């Protein structure tokens, strides 16, 4: 066999290996980390996450696990009007304690919701306050931010709370248009947790 034929067969083998490994990698990601948009999966995840009263105008739209062991659940609800997203509610459970920045990094830049929870430009200093809740003695600490995800983006309000719940760590973020979002809504969400 000539050198040219050996080289051609070698190139073909490398290309086939690349395609094969890419396919196997894609299958692994889709099996372990892909969004579970089916209604049954979202309902199942709602039961696993937290016992909370979600307002009826919020629709569950995105569910997935953010780790390969399928233990850290993420669920995103949107409130929309005529196909315009007014606000998003993000419930995120993890087995270890984490911050807002870590939660955003864990979700990844490609997942929905981050464009309004990760504010690059703040119009005011972030504010903290506490909300008394029924599931524990201590009130839950809440952070409130007002700003924009980018210079061209609309003004967004972001409320976030991180707390321990039934042996897991929970993050609840409510973000969106300030005309449709207020502190009372977020307080009501936290107070509804059982």
What spans do the regions from the language model cover?
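N-terminal targeting sequences that direct proteins away from the cytosol to non-cytosolic compartments
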Residues: 2-83, 113, 165-166, 173-194
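Conserved polar/disulfide-associated segments of primarily extracytoplasmic proteins
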Residues: 28-36, 65-171, 184
């Amino acid at each position: 066999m000539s050198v040219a034929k050996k080289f051609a067969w070698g190139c073909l083998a490398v290309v086939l290996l690349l395609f094969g490994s890419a396919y196997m990698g894609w299958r692994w990601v889709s099996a372990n980390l892909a969004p579970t948009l089916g209604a049954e999966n979202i309902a199942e995840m709602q039961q696993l996450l937290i016992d909370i009263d979600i307002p009826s105008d919020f629709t569950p739209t995105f569910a997935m696990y953010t780790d390969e062991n399928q233990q850290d659940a993420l669920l995103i609800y949107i409130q929309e009007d005529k196909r315009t997203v007014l606000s998003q509610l993000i419930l995120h459970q993890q087995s270890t304690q984490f911050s807002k920045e870590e939660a955003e990094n864990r979700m990844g830049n490609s997942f929905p919701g981050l464009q309004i929870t990760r504010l690059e430009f703040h119009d005011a200093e972030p504010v903290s306050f506490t909300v008394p809740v029924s599931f524990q003695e201590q009130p839950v600490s809440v952070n409130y931010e007002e700003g924009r995800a980018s210079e061209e983006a609309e003004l967004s309000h972001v409320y976030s709370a991180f707390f321990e719940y039934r042996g897991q760590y929970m993050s609840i973020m409510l973000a969106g248009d300030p005309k449709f979002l207020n502190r009372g809504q977020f307080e009501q969400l936290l107070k509804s947790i059982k």
